[in-house]
């Protein structure tokens, strides 16, 4: 929620300025722990990443779930913060799993249960389905991932091109994207949200 809306709803609210340098320092510590476990870390944001644990059992003699539990406990003990973890066979399912039971959540989506897990979720949970495509799908009575899964692959390809194949796969719990450390990005952003959309922004810097 934008700050101006929060102030309108709660005029007596005390707004605390963010401590960006602290957030970045803590993030660096957490990500260094990720990289100690596996070199395959794809950073999405200061507080989000994908980790690939393929082959790590030979090194640690521990299953990924055990390593992640130990990691979460170590981070909470050392830094006083909790992390939410999603463990599954691909990015889509792992990201989905991480959104459940926050904070301090740890959700696993196994191969045999993935279709049952995702079937009743709204199609908006599939990466790449934004407001516009969501509206088009809903217009055609496609509300859930299970609704999408029942469609013919060629129909989706005809309607949405190559992305049609992608969402057809994801409706079956299939995600062909690899963990790509080279594409990692980590940033802190500062935004100004206006009450109405504008087409030209002339000045954005605050006064000194």
Question: Which role does the model predict for each range below?
Answer:
Residues 46-54, 89-91:
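Short, conserved phosphate-binding/catalytic loop or strand-edge motifs used
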Residues 1-46, 50:
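Residues that scaffold, gate, or flank divalent-cation-dependent active/transport sites
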Residues 64, 68-121:
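Long, highly charged, low-complexity intrinsically disordered interaction regions
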Residues 29, 33-37, 70-78, 136, ...:
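Generic non-transmembrane alpha-helical segments
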Residues 125, 133-205:
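DNA-contacting surface of Y-family translesion DNA polymerases
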Residues 51-68:
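Catalytic palm subdomain of template-directed nucleic-acid polymerases
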């Amino acid at each position: 929620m934008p700050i101006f809306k929060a102030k309108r709803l709660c005029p007596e609210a005390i707004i605390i300025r963010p401590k960006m340098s602290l957030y970045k320092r803590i993030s660096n510590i957490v990500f260094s722990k990720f990289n100690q476990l596996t070199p395959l870390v794809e950073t999405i944001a200061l507080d989000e990443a994908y980790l690939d644990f393929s082959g790590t059992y030979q090194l640690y003699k521990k299953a990924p779930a055990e390593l992640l539990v130990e990691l979460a406990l170590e981070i909470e003990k050392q830094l006083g913060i909790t992390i939410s973890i999603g463990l599954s066979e691909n990015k889509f399912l792992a990201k989905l799993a991480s959104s459940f039971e926050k904070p301090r959540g740890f959700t696993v989506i196994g191969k045999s249960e993935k279709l049952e897990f995702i079937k009743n979720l709204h199609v908006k949970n599939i990466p790449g389905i934004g407001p516009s495509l969501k509206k088009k799908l809903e217009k055609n009575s496609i509300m859930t991932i299970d609704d999408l899964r029942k469609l013919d692959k060629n129909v989706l390809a005809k309607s949405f091109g190559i992305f049609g194949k992608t969402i057809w796969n994801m409706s079956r719990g299939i995600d062909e994207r690899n963990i790509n450390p080279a594409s990692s990005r980590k940033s802190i952003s500062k935004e100004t949200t206006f009450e109405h959309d504008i087409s030209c922004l002339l000045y954005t810097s605050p006064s000194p």
